[in-house]
């Protein structure tokens, strides 16, 4: 987790007045959010509040109609494919459904992007993949196929794959929601270790205790807007709005 930043620090991610519509359905309604380097941010809220859409906008997977979104000082514009490619080298994303390639071994899944995108030598790519799999506790699974792994192991491979591009920011979209309860802890422990190592993390999560434990900042989204934002002890301990109090009442214990 990060230490306090000075007021003059330029945010690593700077979002201003972001609006996103699907036809007549406005999903993001003027979102403002600033995230500093090394900060761990958890985004919470009901289903349909815009959490995952916001993450996908940050990664350039979704375009937006109004507002500004800059990453590392560079404005994100959907009509500039080269800029989007550069963005995705620096912004990794882990999805709730793993999205591993079933026909590739675990090691090949982790090696694919550095080989194709960064065109690194194969011996370098392989050594890095082995190192990353060791980092997530799966060094012995290099040659295994995805269908030979548990859901928790597959998600840890997905984390290693996202880290293979050496991203500056890691986006986590409900990374435990598809897992059986007994597998959640192994994935959260890997994410927690990344937070402790200074990775900039932006997480959509329903794991309230985990968010309270690892976050520098918690964002509560409600009906497409940032409704409350603050340090976890403040936001969880003294929610300011009826909407957040109601949400925490049935989501946290």
Predicted regions and their residues:
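C-terminal boundary and immediately downstream tail of ABC-type ATPase nucleotide-binding domains
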Residues: 2-3, 222-223, 229, 233-253
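ABC family nucleotide-binding domain
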Residues: 10-232
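Extreme N-terminus of proteins, especially the signal/transit-peptide cleavage junction
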Residues: 2-11
């Amino acid at each position: 987790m990060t230490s306090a930043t000075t007021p003059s620090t330029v945010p690593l991610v700077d979002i201003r007045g972001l609006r996103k519509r699907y036809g007549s359905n406005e999903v993001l309604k003027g979102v403002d959010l600033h995230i500093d380097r090394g900060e761990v941010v958890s985004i919470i809220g009901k289903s349909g509040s815009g959490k995952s859409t916001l993450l996908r906008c940050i990664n350039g997977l979704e375009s937006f109609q109004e507002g500004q979104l800059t990453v590392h000082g560079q404005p994100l514009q959907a009509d500039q494919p080269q800029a989007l490619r550069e963005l995705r080298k620096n912004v990794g994303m882990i999805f709730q459904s793993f999205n591993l390639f079933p026909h590739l071994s675990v090691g090949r899944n982790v090696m694919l992007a550095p080989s194709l995108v960064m065109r690194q030598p194969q011996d370098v790519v392989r050594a890095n993949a082995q190192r990353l799999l060791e980092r997530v506790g799966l060094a012995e699974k290099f040659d295994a196929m995805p269908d030979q792994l548990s859901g928790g192991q597959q998600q840890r491979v997905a984390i290693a794959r996202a880290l293979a591009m050496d991203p500056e920011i890691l986006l986590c979209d409900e990374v435990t929601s598809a897992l059986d309860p007994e597998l959640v802890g192994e994935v959260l422990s890997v994410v927690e270790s990344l937070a402790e190592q200074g990775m900039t993390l932006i997480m959509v999560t329903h794991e309230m205790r985990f968010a309270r434990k690892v976050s520098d900042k918690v964002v509560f989204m409600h009906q497409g807007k940032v409704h409350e934002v603050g340090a976890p002890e403040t936001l969880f301990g003294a929610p300011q709005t009826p909407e957040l109090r109601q949400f925490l009442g049935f989501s946290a214990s």
